[in-house]
């Protein structure tokens, strides 16, 4: 099953992730192909764009990346046999984090 968690919860302050679960860090600081570009992240954090524009730009970034599409297919496959956690450092404020967009995109594959 595809799941998500906030990085600080994963590090021992909340969500208990089973040892056997597959963990996918989707943070730019971890070099993830599933993270937003620095430009998109800066635009969002500086409030130069709204959530709808962020989602559209993020989807376009991901869909234009062969690496990201390949990783998403692998996540979808793994999630059929066990838990897969997408982990990011964004706070859960109103689900405004790209990991929720990714869950939706992967579910639609």
Predicted stretch roles:
Residues 1-109:
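Residues lining hydrophobic/aromatic ligand-binding pockets adjacent to catalytic sites
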